[in-house]
């Protein structure tokens, strides 16, 4: 290896987020410092994958050196550890882009989530993916020498930083293609200047890497003793894990491979490894993470699988093999049926891609169903992290709507908790005799749902109601119309009918009361005019004087709020005003002869109903005026 400095040396400042990340890593990840080696070897493996891919269309990039690998050497006297690869390498612009900045959207949001709690911070940093910067966990300075494939020897670059505010970059001459990372070790990082410690870490983290990882070590004599001669000895198996038989792979190997492909620190919740032969020949290895990425709900969040074709790496983040509502899935797919020169554009409309997407989707749904059935506690862990994303499924994937619906979890009146633990199948099992609908309520929050006046008749009749209070719920219910042969019924809709649960005597009494109150309803309708769609009596309330509901085919309150929050114009919702003739306030309103006072009562009851339904009203001053006037008269 021969490198010489030449010219064009400059000092540049780090992007501010890089400085913050370096500081946090040194303090938050210290207890797990050996991961720096996993990250750097993983990056070297990626560099080899990228060279293989580019060499498919330009074999000259190999420059006579097609045996790709990673090499580790150390110098205890100089206090340095060097990780070298002969992969794709980097140009000067690449180095500035990748080593001086964090090229990720939403980084400011990520850093805003960090705290002073080191254990929590380390988990967040792990989700962010530290990559190259992990070198500073054990090194007080790092030197990178790199030459991109296809560039001349004198177009190499040297980058150097002590991990503080800036770095230097200069042109050098480098004979070998690829990248050398030289770590100038801290005092507390010297444990890695030891061959057996390096062997231990490589065996733990990098056995599954598909290229050789070698150490520069002494040649053994016939008696197994070290000689003065040295050579490169391969340490890892260098066989891509997914190509091996499942029966030969240990649980720990699957877990470490997940960390390699995802750059996550935590073990996955579960995984599925499958080799399929038939119409399409492919291997898939799919993981369900334990923790959601910090930017999961960001529109620019990168998702998708690693794509290989005939064991050759093609691309990262191939989102064409997973629907958007499964963007939390990590792993890879290795196809024998796609062309090696496949592009993202070709993938988009490719029949093989569509077939593999369908198969992978079903595989993930099966994984989740198995988890929900066999380990409910683990499934609820998954739900807390990814439930909001999975809820997008019924709107996006009609073919698997029933399966997805079975995986959804909600709260309900059956449990006194905001935890979403109730599945639709368990709700159906508990349905009251004669009940043929799944009753649900959407609201802004659990508290608003739990205390909704719409629940009063259901509580009285002992009928369970599913409580939905995530913003996406109302949108999802536009697509989720039934489950297990049972129709969904919103309890805030005018078409709600529970008469089958009432006796004939009760029905007769309600009919008489409705007739008696006909004039009050007409008087109220006359006062309100076009402000409401209709006024009518209701017998579904116990302690509440009035509510508002919408027609079955009219947009609901929560959907209108969702559109408004997204900056879209929502059509005006025309409510039906329902009054409870058995409530003392309604009776007092009915007995009021003075039209102005009657109007104040109507404003009071309508205002209450609108507040309970929407959490707001168009004219609060009119409502407050009605309250003040009525209180003054008492």
Swiss-Prot record:
General function of this protein: Molecular chaperone. Has ATPase activity.
Domain of life from the UniProt record: Bacteria
Primary localization: cytoplasm
Region ranges (A): 1-344
Family: Belongs to the heat shock protein 90 family.
UniProt keyword list: ATP-binding, Chaperone, Cytoplasm, Nucleotide-binding, Stress response
PANTHER family reported in the protein's UniProt record: HEAT SHOCK PROTEIN 90 FAMILY MEMBER (PTHR11528)
Location of region: B: 345-561
Quaternary assembly: Homodimer.
Name of this protein: Chaperone protein HtpG
UniProt key word Repeat: no
GO cellular component, one term: cytoplasm
CDD domains in UniProt: HATPase_Hsp90-like
Pfam family, one: HATPase_c_3
PROSITE patterns named among the record's database cross-references: HSP90
NCBIfam families: PRK05218.1 (NF003555)
Compartment(s) of residence: Cytoplasm
C: annotated segments: 562-634
GO molecular-function terms, A-Z: ATP binding; ATP hydrolysis activity; ATP-dependent protein folding chaperone; unfolded protein binding
Keyword Transit peptide: no
Organism: Vibrio atlanticus (strain LGP32)
Alphabetical list of SMART domains matching this protein: HATPase_c
């Amino acid at each position: 290896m021969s490198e010489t400095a030449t010219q064009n040396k400059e000092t540049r400042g780090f992007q501010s987020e890089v400085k913050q990340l370096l500081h946090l890593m040194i303090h938050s990840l210290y207890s797990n410092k050996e991961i720096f080696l996993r990250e750097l070897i993983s990056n070297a493996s990626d560099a080899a994958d990228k060279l293989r891919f580019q060499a498919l269309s330009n074999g000259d990039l190999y420059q006579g050196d097609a045996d790709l690998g990673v090499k580790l050497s150390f110098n205890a006297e100089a206090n340095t550890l060097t990780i070298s690869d002969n992969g794709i390498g980097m140009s000067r612009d690449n180095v500035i882009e990748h080593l001086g900045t964090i090229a990720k959207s939403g980084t400011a949001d990520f850093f805003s989530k960090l705290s002073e709690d080191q254990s929590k911070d380390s988990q967040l940093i792990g989700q962010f993916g530290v990559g190259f910067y992990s070198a500073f966990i054990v090194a007080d300075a790092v030197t990178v020498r790199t030459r991109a494939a296809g560039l001349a020897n004198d177009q190499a670059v040297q980058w150097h930083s002590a991990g503080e505010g800036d770095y230097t970059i200069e042109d050098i001459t480098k004979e070998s293609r690829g990248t050398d990372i030289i770590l100038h070790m801290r005092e507390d990082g010297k444990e890695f200047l030891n061959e057996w410690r390096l062997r231990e870490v490589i065996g733990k983290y990098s056995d599954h890497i598909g290229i050789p990882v070698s150490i520069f070590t002494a040649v053994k004599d016939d008696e197994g003793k070290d000689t003065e001669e040295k050579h490169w000895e391969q340490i890892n198996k260098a066989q891509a894990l997914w190509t091996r038989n499942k029966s030969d792979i240990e649980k720990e190997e699957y877990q470490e491979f997940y960390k390699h492909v995802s750059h996550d620190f935590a073990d996955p919740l579960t995984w599925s490894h499958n080799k399929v032969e038939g119409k399409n020949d492919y291997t898939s290895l799919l993981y369900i993470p334990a923790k959601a990425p910090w930017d999961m709900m960001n529109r620019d969040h990168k998702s998708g699988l690693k794509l290989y074709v005939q064991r050759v790496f093609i691309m990262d983040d191939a989102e064409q093999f997973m629907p958007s509502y499964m963007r939390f899935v990590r792993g890879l797919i290795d196809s024998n049926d796609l062309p090696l020169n496949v592009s993202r554009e070709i993938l988009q409309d490719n029949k093989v891609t569509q077939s593999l997407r369908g198969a992978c989707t079903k595989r993930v749904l099966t994984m989740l169903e198995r988890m929900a059935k066999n380990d409910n506690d683990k499934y609820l862990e998954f739900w807390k992290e990814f439930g909001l994303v999975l809820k997008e499924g019924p709107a996006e994937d009609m073919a698997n709507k029933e399966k997805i619906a079975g995986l959804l979890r909600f709260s309900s009146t059956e449990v006194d908790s905001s935890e979403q633990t109730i599945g639709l199948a368990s709700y159906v099992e508990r349905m009251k005799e004669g009940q043929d609908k799944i009753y649900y309520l959407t609201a802004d929050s659990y508290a608003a749902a739990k205390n909704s006046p719409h629940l009063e008749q259901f509580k009285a009749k002992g009928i369970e109601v599913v409580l939905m209070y995530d913003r996406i719920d109302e949108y999802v219910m536009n697509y989720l119309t039934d489950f297990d042969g049972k129709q969904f019924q919103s309890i805030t809709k005018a078409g709600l009918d529970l008469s089958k649960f009432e006796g004939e005597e009760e029905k007769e009494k309600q009919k008489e009361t409705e007739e008696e109150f006909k004039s009050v309803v007409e008087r109220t309708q006359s006062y309100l005019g076009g402000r409401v769609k209709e006024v009518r009596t209701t017998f579904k309330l116990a302690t509440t004087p009035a509510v508002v509901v919408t027609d079955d085919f009219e947009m609901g309150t929560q959907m209108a709020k969702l559109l408004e929050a997204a900056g879209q114009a929502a059509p005006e919702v025309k409510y039906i005003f329902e009054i409870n003739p058995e409530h003392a306030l309604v009776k007092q309103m009915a007995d009021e002869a003075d039209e102005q006072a009657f109007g104040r009562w109507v404003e009071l009851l309508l205002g209450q109903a609108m507040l309970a339904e929407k959490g707001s009203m168009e004219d609060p001053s009119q409502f407050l005026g009605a309250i003040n006037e009525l209180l003054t008269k008492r």
